[in-house]
Amino acid sequence: ERTHTGEKPFKCPECQKRFTRDHHLKTHMRLHTGEKPYHCSHCDRHFVQVANLRRHLRVHTGERPYTCEICKAK
């Protein structure tokens, strides 16, 4: 497994950063191309990664999934 060997055979042609998986390189390349395929249906924001869109959607839904360990507020 590449995780344990440190092997990173997929190299970005723009900045030379290396990746263990080809899909990680593909996602990374969006930083260079400016492609933002994930669109918010509530506003005009666009995102490179779907995880960033999911986090952003909390702005619209009011979801606050994390609780403060000290005061228990969300």
From Swiss-Prot:
Assigned keywords, A-Z: Developmental protein, DNA-binding, Gap protein, Metal-binding, Nucleus, Repeat, Zinc, Zinc-finger
GO CC term (a single one): nucleus
Pfam families registered for this protein in UniProt: zf-C2H2
GO terms for biological process, alphabetical: segmentation
Superkingdom, natural source: Eukaryota
InterPro entries given in the database record: Znf_C2H2_sf (IPR036236), Znf_C2H2_type (IPR013087)
Listed SMART domains: ZnF_C2H2 (SM00355)
Xref: PROSITE patterns: ZINC_FINGER_C2H2_1, ZINC_FINGER_C2H2_2
Residue spans, zinc finger C2H2-type: 1-4, 10-32, 38-60, 66-74
Compartments where located: Nucleus
SUPFAM superfamilies: beta-beta-alpha zinc fingers
Principal location: nucleus
Gene3D superfamilies, sorted: Classic Zinc Finger
GO MF terms, alphabetically ordered: DNA binding; DNA-binding transcription factor activity, RNA polymerase II-specific; zinc ion binding
Reported function: Krueppel is a gap class segmentation protein.
Protein family: Belongs to the krueppel C2H2-type zinc-finger protein family.
Protein name in UniProt: Protein krueppel
Organism (species): Bradysia coprophila (Dark-winged fungus gnat)
